[in-house]
Curated annotation (Swiss-Prot):
May play a role in axonal development. It comes from Rattus norvegicus (Rat). Its main location: membrane. Belongs to the FAX family. The gene is Faxc. The lineage of its organism: Eukaryota, Metazoa, Chordata, Craniata, Vertebrata. This is Failed axon connections homolog.
Amino acid sequence: MHWGVGFASSRPCVVDLSWNQSISFFGWWAGSEEPFSFYGDIIAFPLQDYGGIMAGLGSDPWWKKTLYLTGGALLAAAAYLLHELLVIRKQQELDSKDAIILHQFARPNNGVPSLSPFCLKMETYLRMADLPYQNYFGGKLSAQGKMPWIEYNNEKVSGTEFIIDFLEEKLGVNLNKNLGPHERAVSRAVTKMVEEHFYWTLAYCQWVDNLNETRKMLSLSGGGPFSNLLRWVVCHITKGIVKREMHGHGIGRFSEEEIYMLMEKDMRSLAGLLGDKKYIMGPKLSTLDATVFGHLAQAMWTLPGTRPERLIKGELINLAMYCERIRRKFWPEWHHDDDNTIYESEESSEGSKTHTPMLDFSFYSRTETFEDEGAENSFSRTPDTDFTGHSLFDSDVDMDDYTEHEQCK
């Protein structure tokens, strides 16, 4: 019996490995200098009509037929070797021994770390806990179909809640150590409101009502001249998935206006809970802050001109200040080119806005990245500074002192 050999991949397009270098061959055809790669399986199948194949070669002499078959065998062998090389290369890059490998979606092209609240939550948590980690943007979902997920010492964990529990057990970190039993209960209740209710209203605004803007932010590498088409297809597939899952959840059965009313109630609840505190549960960070920030950041920076953006930057300004404090403290490479304000000037046009791409560190550690800079001797008071000259958005502003000072005026 004669056999045929081929390459089968579970995805029809290549994926961007970002800084994870790999053999680049699709880039040669697409004219791109970025590294691309794909992974799949070598499959073998029986040739039922080998005689027909030989007859299909026509009246070529036997030596040509032999050359054709030999060439096919060499191509199959080359495909197999390439596959094995890619697998070995991938395993070398993803060595999770004593290292946290964070799998998440590719960075969007608007300067925001992620369009996924849960990916942003997880990466922010790792920075808050000062845990070095390695990003991997392969696009592969976990065994449960979840994103993000991590690998640590060859163990794979998905679901942000289970990931955090896993890291607390393995590495002894605990952002909630300053919370009492009552505060822990409140924190969990707020987490469920944000992740199981507020999230769906954001998803509706992001992937249904504001789909065209989201499509512009989506980053798809490897599409070459078909990037726009692929982006359109991915966004509309995601839109259908979100609408179907929202309907199953129940919130998708309401009208658009009712969904936005529910969103506003959640945002007002968060604003009321935060008040004038530095963080949601008080002066100290907790896991809840990573959760809330991951979701509110979508309203702040990924939904331009929408109702949640107007609300958070207008009436609920304490939420905007809260987001800015966390962004500046834990994301020094995010929007570092326009730190003076969170608002666009009235004179700026849509075409004049530029976004700095996110810089990704091989192994990120906050202690190696953040260094306190010496304070300047003089300062000028602006509407965005407190009585000490600090920006109201800075992470080290003492909100209690600021409030007391304002009340004494």
